Amino acid sequence: MKKRIDYLSNKQNKYSIRRFTVGTTSVIVGATILFGIGNHQAQASEQSNDTTQSSKNNASADSEKNNMIETPQLNTTANDTSDISANTNSANVDSTAKPMSTQTSNTTTTEPASTNETPQLTAIKDQATAAKMQDQTVPQEANSQVDNKTTNDANSIATNSELKNPQTLDLPQSSPQTISNAQGTSKPSVRTRAVRSLAVAEPVVNAADAKGTNVNDKVTAKDFQLEKTTFDPNQSGNTFMAANFTVTGQVKSGDYFTAKLPDSVTGNGDVDYSNSNNTMPIADIVNDKNEVVAKATYDILTKTYTFVFTDYVNDKQNINGKFSLPLFTDRAKAPKSGTYDANINIADEMFNNKITYNYSSPIAGIDKPNGANISSQIIGVDTASGQNTYKQTVFVNPKQRVLGNTWVYIKGYQDKIEESSGKVSATDTKLRIFEVNDTSKLSDSYYADPNDSNLKEVTDQFKDKITYKYQNVASINFGDINKTYVVLVEGHYDKTGKNLKTQVIQENVDPATGKDYSIFGWNNENVVRYGGGSADGDSAVNPKDPTPGPPVDPEPSPDPEPEPSPDPDPEPTPDPEPSPDPDPDSDSDSDSGSDSDSDSDSDSDSDSDSGSDSDSDSDSDSESDSESDSDSDSESDSDSDSDSESDSDSDSDSDSDSDSDSDSDSDSDSDSDSDSDSDSDSESDSDSDSDSESDSDSDSDSDSDSDSDSDSDSDSDSDSDSDSDSDSESDSDSDSDSDSDSDSDSDSDSDSDSDSDSDSDSDSDSESDSDSDSDSDSDSDSDSDSDSDSDSDSDSDSDSDSESDSDSDSDSDSDSDSDSDSDSDSDSDSDSDSRVTPPNNEQKAPSNPKGEVNHSNKVSKQHKTDALPETGDKSENTNATLFGAMMALLGSLLLFRKRKQDHKEKA
């Protein structure tokens, strides 16, 4: 605020001499004084120059230190701020639209483009699932078409042109009949659709979800029967068990009953579910309307079927049904041909049976002394886990003959490569070779336990004798042998959907002659049987319309899979429109004592979407007494009309080393959209009229349009090199034009998403003479998104060193026209030095007789140093004074005498 100065500056009065009209004598007196103290006047003048220069330098230093100078009040601030506020409003509209567009392009959950694409992805996924289910359904549909008749069928090997080789496979021109007799193998006659499709893996199935109670005590099984009790498992032989069941009383969804198989029997046969939770899916038990009455699974390890009732039974009574399930041999538990107990437990009721396994002998080959002999069996196919593996057992020379130059070929196909899904290669096939100690102990079922003491692993001896030079064929050179070998094959098949067909061939010669070439082969193909059942019950709620269960055919009907319906895409939830904070008068009178060394590491993780309750976790030690009431709940759309006329003359010496990430919205009463949540607690919001030259190298990426026309005279060179990386998507449209040169070194990485729609109307008339030295070291790492529209009238009293703003106007008009006519004949020796000295009187404030003027910090200092120089020496020259006095006395006498004479003459 400009102080009134009603007296002339020292620089204008420094050499002036007061003149008084006292007659002729005044000339003599003036001359006497001039001659008497002339030298001292020069010294005083010189001293005054030094003083003035020193004062000027000090003032300059103070100016640099305080970063503030006195400026007149800006009356246009309110109007300018209003304009800025209006612009800010329109800018906020644009700013809001831009982030929405960006989010739309980048964020899948909200952008329209992604929403449009989602149904396509879902549809593809559902389509794949549907295809998967369809493939799975086809074999089940073919279940009842299995022809269990077994016939002998010759497999011609002579047509294997792929393996012709003069050295190793010089096949004899024997007739098909001869080869058929030698081969002696039989092949099951099955309809094509009865063979498992290997197009896709079956889904991995968990055990039926039996959340309810075991109701075996309510289920009664009857009419149990086995389709047959004798069969050859090595020729795809199996049987079916069928039974009727009834449920007594009421059961509910989740209740279940069980059926358990004996050791000698399995429900999965040669299909491997070890990689699928050891759980095999069973066809659902359905009624004539294809409604599922019970779901069933089979546990491979415990050999237990679990039938779990569905919601269908909740309102039904007299439930009855029938199931038919295929049974196979357990090759490990029934390794030899013979009759085994097959006692089957259904709902805790035992049904005793006997099953006879007539395994076709694995000891097969050409019937002559050096005839080739070999056989094999696929004993496990993984169709459920998606790993597409199979296991095969090969018996080499099971007749234990003496053979020369023996070669064995393991093929992933039979006649044509393209007709099989088998894959045999160095990467797809693992071979383990065992030497048999006692051939008589070989199993009829082709089961071979690698840990059996009858088997000795010799795989390492054949490392250099196994090759894959023919396509889809593994060749093993056994050389001259007289023992039996077991080869365990772990292979893979592809996903073409073709049947898995394999073939093994052995060729050899008579070791004695090197002639008498012999060759024998064996084919394998995996066949799968399916089972199912049906059931129904009487309606408990509508006894007038009973729906008795129809008789169940032993061959189940397939349960069509329901068509999957794509999940609807969720509608994106729009973000609520922010409601403006009603005139948040955020009277932040921040007393900013702020000597704040505010290290403010304030990691103010304020990703705060500028709800800016500016809780800014500011660890800042900043002792900033900043009474800044600014709870800055500054809901950021705050239309903060802050007409704050804050005259703040605060000398705010605030040494607060403020590294001021403070977006220094300078003109800082300026509604201080001052993103400057500057955690610097340095409260360097300091109303700092801030011309704030604040060097703001501020890399502050902050989009803050901060148009704060902050006239901020605050010459504050606040060198805050603020590298403020402020990824702050700080939509802070806060038009704060912040001329603030704020160098703000605050490395404030501020990822603050501060949407800061701050309408900051900031009419702040902020006269802010605030000398706010604001050195605030506030390291302000403050990520503080705080769009705080905090009207922050922060008068930044900041430690205010307000040095006595005593407006000491010193209007002392002391005219002292002392017309001392002195007609007094009084011989007045009055040394009337006329020390009336208006100059001295003008320099004194009327209220301070000692002349120690105590003006405000900005005026008084300058006037102290600019006081008029002493124009005389206190140790006056006595001679000069005496001489002057004598001359004055003489003049007085002469004047007195002349007047006396004049008086006499008049008389």
UniProtKB/Swiss-Prot annotation:
Record PTM Pentaglycyl murein peptidoglycan amidated threonine, positions in chain: T871
Residue numbers spanned by region Ligand binding A region: 45-542
Motif YSIRK-G/S signaling motif: where in chain: 15-26
Keyword field: Cell wall, Peptidoglycan-anchor, Secreted, Signal, Virulence
Description of post-translational modifications: Proteolytically cleaved by aureolysin (aur). This cleavage leads to the inactivation of ClfB.
Cleavage, annotated site positions: S197, L198, A199, V200
Sequence motif: LPXTG sorting signal, positions: 868-872
Function: Cell surface-associated protein implicated in virulence by promoting bacterial attachment to both alpha- and beta-chains of human fibrinogen and inducing the formation of bacterial clumps.
Name under which the protein is recorded: Clumping factor B
Name of the gene encoding the protein in the UniProt record: clfB
